[in-house]
Each structure stands twice: as structure tokens, then as C-alpha cells.
A protein has these predicted regions:
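Helix-start (N-cap) detector for alpha-helical repeat units in TPR-like alpha-solenoids
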Residues: 50, 82-84, 120, 130-131, ...
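Hydrophobic face of amphipathic alpha-helices that form TPR/SEL1-like repeat modules
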Residues: 53-60, 87-94, 133-145, 173-182, ...
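Short coil/turn and helix-start
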Residues: 62-63, 78, 96-100, 122-126, ...
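TPR/TPR-like (Sel1-like) alpha-helical repeat modules
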Residues: 103-115, 223-244, 270-276
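N-terminal leader/linker segments that initiate helical-solenoid repeat arrays
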Residues: 12, 20-67, 71, 85
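Structural signature of tandem alpha-helical TPR/SEL1-like repeats
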Residues: 64-68, 99-108, 148-159, 187-196, ...
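Flexible helix-coil transition and linker loops at the boundaries of alpha-helical arrays
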Residues: 41-43, 77, 111-130, 162-167, ...
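Terminal, low-structured helical/coil segments at or just beyond the last alpha-helical repeat
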Residues: 31, 244-280
Length: 280
């Protein structure tokens, strides 16, 4: 596996240039998000410990008592528990048992990011912390209508960059790549986009595999590698569903397959077999 990683790294530099290392540099810790916000108010119900409150909240949630879950989770969130902050943020973002409220979701995610940004990437709660940064990036990208959270693409880049580099979050890497590809909040740079897509694609991120494959097939700002592009698109196509959500992946694959000649297809198949074998 180590040999494969070294080969992959060499191919990456050969494809995107030695400047690829820049994309791996850790982003600085973001400045505090919620300096003026009031602390979460603990509900009237008291619990023996934060852990008891969290367990009660998750038990109520799984039993379908979402209101009871919110009360218990608010207690744990008031003590800064990362999972409670994340769960409340997700519930308000999705309207899951509570009235949909993006501002409340933003504030819970902000507290989580502020209080746990230095969490070890190897910790059990790292995934929820990085997920909060990704959610914040999405909120900053478009803003929240009729609230103090305005559109701030540069701040979105900061959120995605931190989660992408410090936590190696594939969703953050994908979103950051999209911003580089579009030139939103950052200077447009297809090579940087390809590097971040590549990092996420290697983790099995389907949309990143599709867009990386498309970039390599078309040579859009990066050296054209049709066979490798078709390989990534094939992986994305195999992982996609036949529903409308993934239709764009199917379309990109069909276009790439039609544009490829027989030698491209054979080499793509060989690369695909190598890729799969290396991960067994």
C-alpha cells in the first residue's frame, strides 16, 4: 500500500505540477465566529451529568420524541458537548422534529467550530467538528436571508479550507475545489481545483471523482489525460444511482465514453483494475 501511495504521489506531481504541495498546506485556525452570541441556555430539567443529558436526548430522539430530545441536547450543548451541538445544528438545518431555522443551525455549528476547532483529527468527534465547518462554509457562501449572516464567499473559503486541510474532510475538499474551479471567493485556479478534487476522489467521494474525471478528459486548465479521466468517471458512474440527483454524473460519463477512442478505453480499464487492486 505504501508503494502505491508513493506511485500515486509521483503521478499527482507529474499531472498537476510540483506546486501540488501548496494545496496540502494546513489552513490557519479560523477567527471566532460567534463572539457576540449569548450562550446556550440550559433547560429547566437537570441531569446528573452532560453524558446523561446526551444519552437521554439520543434515546428520546430515537424513540421519536424530538421535543424531549431537544431539551436534553440543549442541556448538553450548554456545557459545550460537541455531539449535542452538532445534532441540534442538524435538526434545525433539516427541520427534523423542530421548525426549520437556518440561523439557529448556524449558531449551533458556530459554537461547535469555535469551541472544538483544535480537536485532534484522529479523535472520535473529529467528523462532527469538520462537518460543522462544512455547514458553515455553505451558509457563508449564500448567506441566510433576513439575518445578520450575509453572503461572504471569502469566509466560505476559510471554512472549507480549514476542514479540508486540518481534518482532511472529503466534503470540504470537494466544496473548496468547486470554489477554485469557479473562482468564487478565491482566484480561479483549475489546477488547485484538480488537486482538491483528487484528494476527495481518493477517499471515494463520488462527485469529486466525476468532476476530476471531467477535468482530465477535457484538459480544462490541467494537462489532458483522457484514460485517467475516463477511469475516474467510470468509478463515479458505478457509485451513482439512476435517480435525478446523479443524472449529471451519468451524462458526463456517457459524453466521456463517447469521446474516448478504443485505446483510451482499454487503458482506462487497466488503470481501473490497478486502482481497485491497490485498495484490496
Amino acid at each position: 500500500m505504501r508503494t502505491f501511495k508513493l506511485i500515486a504521489a509521483a503521478l499527482w506531481v507529474a499531472t498537476f505540477g510540483a506546486g501540488a504541495a501548496y494545496a496540502l498546506d494546513a489552513a490557519p485556525r479560523p477567527q471566532p465566529l460567534t463572539p457576540a452570541l449569548a450562550p446556550v441556555l440550559a433547560p429547566a430539567t437537570k441531569y446528573g451529568s452532560v453524558r446523561d443529558a446526551l444519552r437521554s436526548g439520543m434515546r428520546d430522539y430515537n424513540a421519536g420524541d424530538k421535543i424531549g430530545a431537544v431539551h436534553a441536547l440543549e442541556y448538553a450543548a450548554g456545557e459545550g458537548h460537541s455531539l449535542a451541538l452538532w445534532k441540534l445544528g442538524r435538526m434545525y438545518a433539516d427541520g427534523d422534529g423542530v421548525q426549520h431555522d437556518d440561523l439557529k443551525a448556524f449558531e449551533y455549528f458556530s459554537r461547535l467550530a469555535d469551541q472544538h476547532a483544535d480537536e485532534s483529527p484522529d479523535s472520535p468527534t473529529a467528523a462532527v467538528v469538520s462537518s460543522a465547518f462544512v455547514a458553515l462554509g455553505s451558509y457563508f457562501l449564500d448567506g441566510i436571508k433576513d439575518t445578520y449572516v450575509g453572503a461572504n464567499p471569502e469566509r466560505a473559503v476559510e471554512m472549507f479550507s480549514y476542514a479540508a486541510s486540518y481534518f482532511s474532510d472529503s466534503n470540504a475538499q470537494y466544496n473548496l475545489a468547486r470554489l477554485y474551479l469557479e473562482g468564487t471567493g478565491v482566484r480561479k485556479d483549475a489546477r488547485h481545483a484538480a488537486r482538491w478534487f483528487n484528494l476527495a476522489a481518493e477517499k471515494g467521494h463520488t462527485a469529486s471523482q466525476a468532476l476530476l474525471g471531467h477535468l482530465l478528459m477535457t484538459g480544462q486548465g490541467v494537462p489532458r489525460q483522457r484514460s485517467k479521466g475516463l477511469m475516474w468517471l467510470t468509478l463515479a458512474r458505478e457509485a451513482s444511482t439512476d435517480g435525478p440527483k446523479d443524472q449529471w454524473i451519468v451524462t458526463l460519463y456517457d459524453q466521456a465514453f463517447a469521446a474516448a477512442d478504443e485505446s483510451d478505453r482499454k487503458l482506462a480499464l487497466a488503470l481501473l483494475e490497478q486502482y481497485i487492486q491497490a485498495r484490496r
